[in-house]
Amino acid sequence: MSKLKITNARRKQRVRIALRRAAGGRPRLSVFRSSKHIYAQVIDDQKGETLASASSLEKTMREGGKTGANIDAAKAVGKLLAERAVKNGVKEVVFDRGGYLYHGRVKALADAARESGLSF
């Protein structure tokens, strides 16, 4: 395994351990990004169910002409996810960046979710 993959795997483990300690029963906002799209979901780990989700693959996003590979799409996904989560009664979450650096698309999604009503 390359040194970069080992470093990324260790970072992901550290993030998960810290989240478990800090969660305090709050749902987790999990982010996954690929080279072409970005996905986010609010997960209740105690019940094992997804409370809200959004991605750049959704029809409303594609009709808007936004690809998932840029910051604008990440902002739109964050806003959409926050609206759905607030509608389902979730206002406080723990942000799970999934080992990704808090920069670029991940940061844009988090900022948009905060602006739309989620607190973390």
Curated annotation (Swiss-Prot):
Keywords recorded for this protein, A-Z: Ribonucleoprotein, Ribosomal protein, RNA-binding, rRNA-binding
Gene Ontology biological-process entries: translation
The keyword rRNA-binding belongs to this UniProt entry's keyword annotation: yes
Domain of life from the UniProt record: Bacteria
A single MF term (Gene Ontology): structural constituent of ribosome
Pfam families: Ribosomal_L18p
RNA-binding listed as a keyword: yes
Any single Gene Ontology cellular-component annotation: cytosolic large ribosomal subunit
InterPro entries: Ribosomal_uL18_bac-type, Ribosomal_uL18_bac/euk
Family named by the database record: Belongs to the universal ribosomal protein uL18 family.
Alphabetized NCBIfam families for the sequence: L18_bact
Quaternary structure note: Part of the 50S ribosomal subunit; part of the 5S rRNA/L5/L18/L25 subcomplex. Contacts the 5S and 23S rRNAs.
UniProt-listed HAMAP family: Ribosomal_uL18_B (MF_01337_B)
Role of this protein: This is one of the proteins that bind and probably mediate the attachment of the 5S RNA into the large ribosomal subunit, where it forms part of the central protuberance.
Protein name (Swiss-Prot/TrEMBL): Large ribosomal subunit protein uL18
